[in-house]
């Protein structure tokens, strides 16, 4: 699983860094009174996700084949992690179907389950910003892999509307493609 779940050497590196930091901190006597530290007004990276939050897809306006329900997992190939089962999510397997949601912020993405049938989403933000996002990941071939995809990260702060359409481009060898959204990611 790459850098997300390191093997023993990666875990040891993280543990050693934490130990070193704590030991150095404890060498000094504690301050008599704690001082609160706030987040600087001017961030080092203006596109930081410091205001990141989830937005429920339940609020989306659905057209065509989008549904807010639990998919029929038993009919779908690929492994599934139990923590994502038994819950409703926003999903479609019908190319051309559109879901639209309003949000406030400067960035929008989605936390998805990308399985063997993961497709391509076309997006339009405020009728101007357009693009596509491929939902599949190399781990999606045998697993409904949880991952986040970003549609835009540098919007003008404020109110926006995004429309998502399952693309015909995601179909492979006549098989259907799908999109499964657990949460929208907004900053």
Task: For the regions a language model picked out, list residue spans one by one.
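Conserved catalytic region of serine esterases and O-acyltransferases that act on ester linkages
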Residues: 1-187
């Amino acid at each position: 699983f790459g850098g997300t779940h390191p093997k023993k050497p990666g875990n040891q590196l993280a543990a050693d860094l934490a130990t070193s930091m704590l030991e150095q901190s404890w060498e000094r006597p504690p301050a008599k009174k704690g001082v609160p530290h706030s987040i600087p007004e001017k961030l080092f990276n203006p596109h930081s996700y410091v205001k990141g939050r989830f937005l429920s897809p339940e609020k989306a306006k659905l057209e065509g084949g989008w549904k807010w329900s639990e998919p029929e997992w038993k009919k779908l190939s690929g492994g599934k992690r139990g923590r994502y089962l038994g819950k409703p999510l926003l999903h479609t397997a019908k190319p051309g179907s559109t879901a639209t949601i309003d949000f406030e912020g400067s960035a929008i993405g989605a936390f998805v389950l990308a399985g063997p049938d993961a497709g391509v989403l076309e997006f339009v933000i405020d009728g101007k910003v357009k693009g596509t996002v491929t939902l599949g990941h190399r781990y999606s071939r045998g697993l409904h892999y949880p991952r986040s995809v970003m549609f835009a990260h540098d919007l003008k702060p404020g109110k926006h509307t995004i429309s998502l359409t399952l693309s015909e481009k995601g179909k492979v060898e006549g098989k259907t493609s799908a999109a499964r959204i657990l949460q929208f990611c907004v900053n």
